């Protein structure tokens, strides 16, 4: 047979509707001869083939092709192969040489190597549009007529290459396709993108850029504080905190005097025991839930801790914080009742959060549970143990403590707590008296008070009245408010009052002005509104869907899944489980329940604080850039933010930032409004409106539901009103009024003055039955009018409040980009006029510490099962460390390097032996003990820890590596605690710096008879380091 060997064929196929090349073999450079010579095989069907299954079988006959058709197929295959090679060569050259191929050009800026590529006829083929078989739809390609066209047209946002793109002329490397520009950057013109793309402007919101945790050029959220500013801030802090520090010290001195009286000791001889708690533990009183910062009393048997305030109350005859759990009886009657109908009681337990939302949308309310209430409607006590919370804040809830169960009956009944005539408090568990213990070095707070008083006597403190009581720049020459000032906003109409106007500067005014103007208003407890803070940022999008894309994780070991979240339904204030994408769809387009009422959902603290910083580093950086008055608000190094003064290894409260995402409507609905109910924050706060979206108009049938709501309110809430027709008209009219909402308005704020709180609480207690809360049930009782967070005052109640008590709040609209600074102690409520995304951050200013202490006293008197009971701020601990930090800044003393976090005694980690050497090595001469006896005492304590560790080990484990680690950890714990709590009277000089380590070694040598390999190895390590 005279045929040429066939080496390969190039085939052009369409797979799944997409054109592409699939090469089976390398194409032969020889000319293939497809003319079949005449053979005898044609007659009998060709030669037989052998196979495993079919044995000898004949191949299928194929129709013969004429010579011209075969030749055309070979030419086409060779043409396509050459086309692919040309495209690859062109792409490599273009990627190497930054040249632009103009349409129709074959010279000029085009590289020589690709001049042979025909841009005209085959321009589509170069970009990947390969000729396909007849009848097949060709693949969509990029329009080659775009100026700056290149073969590489992959969009930076979506990573697709089959779309029309805009190429950046600044970096000449990034491209954005038109669909992405229309979807994610609708406010940016395509011509502007071509001049300078979003990547170059640091506003790109693709997932990769949003998760970029490196510093970007031109964006710096750090606050640079000069030494002079540090000194001035320290003087201001000491002047503000000295009275509070004295109060803390007096409280401790009084308890020490009681201790001296009980045991017949002199005051100087009182030595409270070390509580052996670690810096990253959070210890609070088991009775009043107040944070314990230093001195407290403890039961050795049941591990009960009691703060000094509770000790004083018990000795006075009654523990005021010992109260019974409160019960709120809110009954679930279904969605029909929530919209004015009778409804029927649903007795099934709320097992699934997602059932409630499904019921509202699908319409099966009677046979499914209604969801989980946000509060505690049945009044049952928490399932959580009532004992103290020790350990890290991020401990898993499944971790079981080693402590024995504690009998908590004595927490509820004050009569069980008693003290004898001497002042000894006996624990109700029957184990004996409570022991006085400490967390800080003995006498440290008294020493701080003495140092601050000496500094004040030397005239080194900043005189507070001179800085804030000068004439405000907002006032005119007659010392009256200049109402024509552009930095003032009228927010109230109180007669005879000069605080109807709020200070509202722009972000640029705040940056150019000093802090005195702000302090003038802030020290009076007035909120401040800083306008257009987003102008100081790069312009990164805060649209919730953009943030959702950055946080979205289908499956990730570290981050987990964030597809489903728990939201709050603003109609009945119950928690529901909702898909995050569906939630954001309702955020922009609006959603309605099966009865036609707006379904308003609210996300609080989404994403969680840890995810916000990890998955949204760009947004976290952007938020820090937008913060106004950074000396007060910066969460890392704000010199006047007391929250940053805590030691690095200390457990810090969660101060944010936190996001609040919710849909909203301009019209006040009366029920189901997107509101944050009346409350007081535990500290100062700054709230920035970062994004708004207007929801389309409501459905027409909503008016009928409003009328049913008003009839139900008249029947259940206002049954005692004489003129019911007039009241009915008032209710309907109040819900028909639409707030005057401008384009950039987002939220309506009502902030009450501190001096108006007694009248506000009196009004709520008087009219509390006119409000609804869980399941739209009337509020039956009031524990605390503000801390219950059960009330939102509508425009009707705001009007009635002014008529009856003569008070009114500051009321204003928060616009897009406005930052509202709320002083602690000012009750406030918020209603969203549009769908809003707000980001909030807490901080503690020196001026408002007294209000933080006042709120702490109120929290401790709430019932044990009240959600606001626990003191999460720990302001007294903050005061002590802030004073210490300020004194060190004034004296020029550098802050000590943070110790490695000590682990819990029950489960110490490995590598602790190295921590011992480092802790001893880093000690300054002033921190060494001054006597041989003190050294001997510490050494004996360390060796005793070794002895105990060895005795507790089984014989088989004495020489194991695990045993060595556990004993070393015990050594570290004992040594660290002894070194940490060295009193000021036992300091030693520089010459005695090297005494400690040799004494420890000698003590080990005397006890070497144990013969443990662990002890020998540790002694050798100590001798080799020779500190």
Curated annotation (Swiss-Prot):
GO cellular component terms attached to this protein's record: nucleus
Enzyme Commission code: 1.14.11.65
Biased composition regions of type Basic residues, renumbered to the chain: 48-63
EC supergroup of this enzyme: oxidoreductase
Impact reported for residue 681 to A: Loss of activity on H3K9me2/1
Record: residues binding Zn(2+) 1: 155, 158, 177, 180
Gene Ontology biological process terms in this record: epigenetic regulation of gene expression; stomatal lineage progression
Cofactor(s) demanded: Fe(2+)
Occurrences of domain JmjC (ranges): 635-860
Calcium recorded as keyword: no
Basic and acidic residues bias (residue ranges): 8-17, 64-74, 346-370, 379-410, 889-903, 919-932, 948-965, 975-996
Keywords: Chromatin regulator, Dioxygenase, Iron, Metal-binding, Nucleus, Oxidoreductase, Transcription, Transcription regulation, Zinc, Zinc-finger
Family designation: Belongs to the JARID1 histone demethylase family.
Name of the protein described by the UniProt record: Lysine-specific demethylase JMJ25
Gene label: JMJ25
